[in-house]
Structure formats: C-alpha cells, structure tokens
From Swiss-Prot:
One of its GO terms (biological process) is AMP salvage. The gene is adk. AMP binds at T31, R36, Q57, L58, V59, G85, Y86, P87, R88, Q92, R139, R150. Its EC number is 2.7.4.3. It is found in: Cytoplasm. PROSITE patterns: ADENYLATE_KINASE. This is Adenylate kinase. Transmembrane segments: none annotated. One of its GO terms (molecular function) is adenylate kinase activity. Monomer. Belongs to the adenylate kinase family.
Length: 194
C-alpha cells in the first residue's frame, strides 16, 4: 500500500496515518523526519541538506526528492508507505510520479481529508484550552493567527495537489470532519481494492 494523505493542518492526517501504520505495518514517511535522518547519517545528500539548512534556506525540491527516493528504497518500505508532508507542490508530485515509475511502483491512492476551515480553527482553540487546563506547554504556533497563516499557506501551495491528483485519477475525497473511526473506515474501504 502506497498512499498520500492530503488535507490542511489539523485535518487529522497524522492521526489517520498513525492508525494505518499500526494496522498495516507500513511506515509513515515524514519529510521532516527523513531530512533529519539524512543529516544525522551524514550521507552525501544529508550533508547537502545540512549546508542549506545551516544557511537558513529552504531545502530544494531536488534534495527533498532524492531523500524521499532513497527512503522509499529502504527495506521497511517494501510493502508500502504513507507519505506525510510530501509532496507539497505539483512539481514535487510530478517528480514523485517519475520516481515511483522508475522503481516499477505506483501510488494506490491519494486521499484528501476535506474539512471546514472555521471548524478547524475551533478545533485548534479547543486543543489549546485543553492543553492549558492540563497545565502543559502550548506550542508557539498554536494560536488562531498562526494557524490561519498555515491554512493560507496550505491553500496557496499545497491545495493545487488536489487538482493534479484528480487529473491523474488517483484522488479520493473523504469527509475529514467525521469522527476518527468513520474516517478510518472510509479510508479502509478505499484501500480494499488496492
């Protein structure tokens, strides 16, 4: 099973990916984790990524694509993977398609969790209130203004992936506002034929 979960911040992608990785025994491939691992391993591509990050710049698509390609070749990905935070742009999606094709692989599905953005903001505010009530530390970017900025960035940069994957016939849309168990069941229904 090779899967991409799409949706704005707070849509539940991480929750669903966690449930799917446990059930199917496949890894969740997070761009951030892959970058950190490549840097820690001091691989050639990791050294290039570190130099860019140390200079305070964004890591290029070329470097990210190569790191993803190498990670997909790892033995734990033999039965599939869930991509988290990649691709973020249409050029990355096109590179992923070429990369998988070159390895004789293809995506089984691209699942978009459709959510109401106002409800997401309320969900985030509730999470912050619960965190404060527990006496725990709140993340610096867990405030309505920062969250709305992340939503705008998602709409501008990542949302065009929906159109791209709709055009390839791989996109499946699920109501991300449903209870977690219902969302999981719907994802499983999509993946059964895969």
């Amino acid at each position: 099973m090779r899967l991409i979960l799409l949706g704005p911040p707070g849509a539940g992608k991480g929750t669903q990916a966690g449930l799917l990785t446990k059930k199917h025994g496949i890894p969740q491939l997070s761009t951030g984790d892959m970058l950190r691992a490549a840097v820690a391993q001091q691989s050639e591509i990791g050294k290039r990524a570190k130099a860019v990050m140390d200079a305070g710049q964004l890591v290029s698509d070329e470097i990210v694509n190569q790191i993803v390609s190498e990670r997909i070749d790892a033995p734990d990905c033999a039965n599939g993977f869930i991509l988290d935070g990649y691709p973020r742009t249409v050029p990355q999606a096109q590179a992923l398609s070429q990369m998988l094709s070159g390895k004789g692989l293809k995506l089984d599905a691209v699942i978009e969790l459709k959510v109401d953005e106002n409800a997401l903001v309320k969900r985030m505010e509730s999470r912050v209130a619960e965190t404060i009530a527990k006496g725990a530390q709140v993340r610096s970017d867990d405030n309505p203004e920062a969250f709305r900025k992340r939503l705008v960035e998602y709409r501008e940069k990542t949302a065009p992936l929906s159109s791209y994957y709709a055009g390839t016939g791989e996109l499946r849309i699920i109501n991300g506002m449903a209870p977690v168990e219902e969302v999981t069941a719907e994802i499983e229904r999509i993946l059964v034929p895969a």
